[in-house]
Each structure stands twice: as structure tokens, then as C-alpha cells.
């Protein structure tokens, strides 16, 4: 019986560092992806603030549309990667033990999904004009700045807080 208790203790001590390493690795990937998301979002917002399309630039293939399409395509790719990372991260968490953190992840995934619903509604290359008009109008709203703040600022802070909590 004592041997079983010692074995269980050693097994538990051995598993915790592996779990912490997995969490840390996944969180680092998520944070890296969030930084890329922030850069591309800043690029998009800066682009929308500083550049105004001339009537001829509304046509697909003009310099303005090409810049917009490049920014949007990168932003959509990064957002898709971030969704994948979040799904993979939730797999390593135990629903019974980390339920609060999983709810936090889901809340941020929902914020990201609301952003994606706007930026991904129309293909920025094929339906450039529709995409531009929708994104320009929607990102002016206060709701989207709050969603972006949630994903870009509060989400990484919550990940760090969770890691500090489980590593103690």
C-alpha cells in the first residue's frame, strides 16, 4: 500500500511538469499568433484611417484594392490559425479541473468569431468592393473596438494569469 502511494506521488509529480510544458508551449504559440493578429489588425485600421479610395481605385486590381486584399488575406489566415491553436489548446485542458479557464477561452473565441464574421463575410479578392464596404462600416463601430481589445489585450493577460495559477 505504501509502495502504491509512493508510486502515485511520483507519477503525479512526473505528470505536472509535462502538463505545464504543454500549456506553456501552446500559450506561447497563441500569444505569438495574437501578436500577428494585432499587427495585421493595426495595419488594417491604419489603412482604413489613412487611405481613402479614389473612384477608380474601387475597381479590383488598382493599387488601393491590392493593398487592402493583401492585408485582409493575411488577417484572415492569421485568424484561422488562431482558431486552430485555441481548439488544440482546449484539448490539453481537463474540463472538470480547468472549467473556468475553458469558459474564458470560449468567451475569447466568441469575440474572435464575431470579428471573423465581419472580415470573412466576403472574400476580399473576389468580392473586394463588398468586403471593403462592410469592413469599413463595421470596424467604425464601438462594438468592434471592444472585441479587438478583448482578444488583443485581455486574452494574453488571462493566459498568463492561468499559467501562474497552475504552476504554483
Regions from the language model: what does each represent?
Residues 17, 21-28, 66-69, 73-76, ...:
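Short, solvent-exposed segments of well-ordered alpha helices
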Residues 4, 20-23, 98:
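Alpha-helix boundary/capping and short turn/kink residues
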Residues 4, 17, 40-43, 47, ...:
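Amphipathic, soluble alpha-helical interaction motifs
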Residues 52-69:
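A solvent-exposed, charged loop/short amphipathic helix patch at secondary-structure junctions
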Residues 6-9, 32-35, 39-42, 46, ...:
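Generic structural signal for well-ordered, non-membrane alpha-helices
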Residues 12-57:
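Amphipathic, membrane-active segments
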Residues 1-17:
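Membrane-embedded hydrophobic alpha-helical segments
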Residues 70-168:
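An amphipathic alpha-helical interaction surface
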Amino acid at each position: 500500500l505504501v509502495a502504491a502511494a509512493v508510486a502515485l506521488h511520483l507519477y503525479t509529480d512526473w505528470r505536472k511538469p509535462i502538463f505545464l510544458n504543454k500549456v506553456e508551449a501552446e500559450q506561447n504559440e497563441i500569444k505569438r499568433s495574437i501578436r500577428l493578429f494585432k499587427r495585421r489588425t493595426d495595419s488594417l485600421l491604419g489603412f482604413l484611417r489613412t487611405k481613402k479610395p479614389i473612384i477608380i481605385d474601387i475597381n479590383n486590381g488598382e493599387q488601393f484594392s491590392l493593398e487592402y486584399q493583401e492585408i485582409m488575406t493575411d488577417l484572415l489566415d492569421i485568424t484561422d490559425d488562431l482558431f486552430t491553436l485555441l481548439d488544440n489548446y482546449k484539448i490539453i485542458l481537463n474540463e472538470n479541473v480547468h472549467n473556468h479557464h475553458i469558459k474564458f477561452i470560449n468567451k475569447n473565441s466568441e469575440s474572435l468569431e464575431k470579428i471573423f464574421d465581419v472580415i470573412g463575410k466576403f472574400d476580399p479578392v473576389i468580392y473586394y468592393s463588398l468586403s471593403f464596404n462592410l469592413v469599413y462600416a463595421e470596424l467604425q463601430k464601438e462594438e468592434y473596438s471592444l472585441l479587438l481589445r478583448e482578444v488583443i489585450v485581455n486574452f494574453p493577460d488571462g493566459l498568463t494569469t492561468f499559467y501562474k495559477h497552475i504552476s504554483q
